[in-house]
Amino acid sequence: MVPLMSRLVRRWGARAVGLVLTAIGLYVVFPTLLTVFGSWPRLRDIAVWWFIVVVALVVGSMASLWWLTRLALQQRTGPDGAWSTVSWGTAASAHLAGNAAGKVVPGGPATAGVVQARLLIQSGEPPSAVASAITAMGLLTTGILLMLPVLTIPALLIGPPPAKQLELGLVMSLAVAVVMVALSTAILVWTPFVAAVGRASGRVLHVVKHDATAESVSATLVRSRDRVVASFDERRTRAILAATGNRMFDFAALVAALAALGVHARASEVLMAYCVSQALALIPITPGGLGFVESGLTTLLVLVGVTPDQAVVGTLLYRLIAFWMPIPLGALAWAGWRINLHLRRPARPTREVGPED
């Protein structure tokens, strides 16, 4: 009886705690969600073409990850050493299904990675290659996200006054993307620079975590960089472009959602709000940071000068397309992938029935 109870506790205990934490988290952020979704009627005041722009930018963000997946899984095959990789359809289906799972099930990126890996492996990709690819993609996209605040701080200090139209933020996203590509390339090819960044980060981290030294953090950062370089090899420039495109298209979608409301704010301040919201999305308490992102984003937008009404409606438009739209798309992608997998699977041979049967 005791071993049975022990197995049940080990199997379901962590899940029960996770569900309780999720329920508490949703209870805390429920008023914010109610306020955001309560502004639904205001969406009718937005021109239709702004919806098209935001959808196109979000699709561009997702397509960048599909491209990154194809680059990470590219390998030489055959006697002539030709390059081969997963199809666009498989890469898209795996990402959409994983992304949807990460937005529905608590666990976020971890859940998304497991589902994405499962689809890629069942599509015929070697498990070791898939594990290496997903790890490298995670390191690269996380590095790009961590780089954004570093580039945002100088822009906040020397940035121009608020523009009459936030559409200039779309131009800023392009400029930031160029700087990020250049800086990321330097990180991947210049080891002394990576080591110096690691030592500087280690000194800061040592203040709050005494067992972390400058040299240990530097060595860890160099090892992580080497894993990314080994995974993408000579395709690293394209990989940087894809990872940067994923973030900057997503940021541009937020800018477009606010521009649709005639918001007047510095694009650099909106970028900082975006960075914080993406960090909140990593909180594993609620699926995809649901509620925490809405609360943090609306609060920060108000702090940078956006009116409360515009902040709520802009957040609703952005999250409606960037968070909620991919969920049904992921379900459809998973269903389509299952049907396609079943159709491609060879029929099971049948045995002729003889008289003795």
Spans of model-derived segments:
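Alpha-helical transmembrane segments and their immediate interhelical loop/hinge regions
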Residues: 214-261
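Short alpha-helical transmembrane interface motifs in multi-pass membrane proteins
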Residues: 22-23, 50-54, 97-102, 210, ...
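Membrane-embedded helical hairpins/re-entrant loop segments and their flanking transmembrane helices
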Residues: 64-97, 258-273
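Short helix-coil transition sites and intra-membrane helix breaks within transmembrane domains
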Residues: 59-74, 102-114, 282-293
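Hydrophobic/aromatic residues in alpha-helical transmembrane segments
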Residues: 25, 35, 64-72, 116, ...
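A short amphipathic helical element positioned immediately N-terminal to and/or at the very start
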Residues: 37-45, 120, 220-232
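Membrane-interfacial helix-loop connectors
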Residues: 76-77, 258-283, 287-317
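Transmembrane helix-loop-helix hairpins in multi-pass inner-membrane proteins
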Residues: 1-40, 98-211, 290-357
